[in-house]
Amino acid sequence: MTSILYSGGDIFDGTGELLKGHAVLVDDDTIKDVAPAEKFSDYQGERVDTSGGTLMPGIADCHVHLVYKGEADPRSSIEGVNPGEITLRVLENAQLSLKSGITAVRDCGGREYLEFPVRDACNSGRFFGPNIMASGKMICMTGGHGNRNGRIADGCDEVVKAVREQIHAGSDLIKIMATGGVMTPRVNPEDAHYSAEEMNAGVSEAKRFHKTSASHAQGAEGIMNAVKAGITSIEHGIFMDQECLDAMMERGTY
């Protein structure tokens, strides 16, 4: 068993004030104890001095697109790029996240499921990386936000089919585009894209197979359509109003 004691700096455990004069004992990559440093006065194993720093839990980033590197024009950055190269970029971005203190990410839309093998490799411990949840293809309407890389579906039956396709491909959650967005030409971010009926069909099918769901939703009407359908989380929510907030609070929507 390999053990390491981290001591000297502050500790933030996510539940209250900074802990001072405490130490963290790690055995085989598992935190075994967090206690006042005096408790470990007789410790004979490896020590790491964290003086001047703060230890804290890993951060979960709930909305990433691992195929991109934060470019101003993300679509152009992968257009015409070999799928193998894109997969390597996904792995690089995942590993950079972990090196930055992000221990879990939720990928909310990738490219032809190239992120799935990276997810599996990182989650299994085969490669260094964070825990990854991945949605697969974003489900969107014809001409809607995300249509260039997403799964286009129109009407309730087609939306249900699209959800089933993502589940079959191995998606951890379902991503549905409720409104327009700023990265798609000639699309108004405030416009509702899917109708209330279409949103309900997609979210209900996700729930039927025990999947959480996320909705790109910026305009108030689209946000309400998603919330009333039972969506797990609203992504962005730029133009939400008090009615949207009240509905989210009532339903426990993130």
Please give the residue ranges for each predicted region.
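Short, acidic/polar
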Residues: 86-94, 154-166, 218-222
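Active-site gating loops and adjacent loop-to-helix segments of metal-dependent hydrolytic enzymes
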Residues: 65-86, 95-98, 128, 136, ...
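Divalent metal-coordination and catalytic microenvironments
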Residues: 9, 24, 29, 52, ...
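Metal-associated gating/positioning segment near the N- to mid-region
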Residues: 53-124, 197, 229
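Active-site gating/metal-coordination segments in enzymes
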Residues: 143-200, 232
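Histidine-rich, glycine-flanked metal-binding segment
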Residues: 2-5, 11-56
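Active-site core of metal-dependent hydrolases
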Residues: 180-254
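Divalent metal-dependent hydrolysis catalytic cores, especially in the metallo-beta-lactamase
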Residues: 89-115, 128-140, 171-184, 212, ...
